[in-house]
Amino acid sequence: MVTIYYTAALVLSVIFFMILWSMGHNQNIPSLLMAFTCVIINNGACLALSLAKNVDEALLANRFVYLAGVFLPLFLLTTICQLLRVRLSDRKLLVMTLINFAVLFMTYTPGYTDWYYKSVSIDTSDGFTRLVKEYGPLHNVYIILLFLYVAAMIVIIAAALFRQQRCSYKYASVMLIS
């Protein structure tokens, strides 16, 4: 059942990406396309994880899940900034990208060190594979990264609404609610 869910999610994400791509000739929001690409990678990696036969395959799939998970918030933040006409400086983008790569490096250490996961095994008892992991000392860094991105998105949306910038209030309101 889980494999069917992940397959359906992957197929739908590819369809939505193709729809966005075909509409993209009139839009200039490359970060939204990158966000959709991250969703496709995540869904494909979750499907691969559910089908993994051993720990090495599961860890490889998990690395792709984190590849998408680390960069999706960055692309969503830049999409929000583009839609609301908020300029992110090149320096801020560089710093955020470097931080993302550092966190990505940490998420790739399972199987080599115990920084991110102290121990990893797989469980296939329910007809699909899932990782059974004991979190290491650096696992909270990823959660903090996600929290900071969500907080930044909320602040940018709220600031755009309250400063009455030249942006679509429909976009800002919908983004703030969601």
Regions found by a protein language model. Name each.
Residues 110-126:
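Membrane-interfacial helix-loop-helix modules of multi-pass inner-membrane proteins that assemble, modify
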Residues 121-138:
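Juxtamembrane membrane-water interface segments that cap and precede transmembrane helices
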Residues 2-10, 44-46, 159-178:
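Interfacial "cap-and-anchor" motif at the non-cytosolic start of specific transmembrane alpha-helices
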Residues 1-13, 24-113, 137-148:
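Individual alpha-helical transmembrane segments in multi-pass integral membrane proteins
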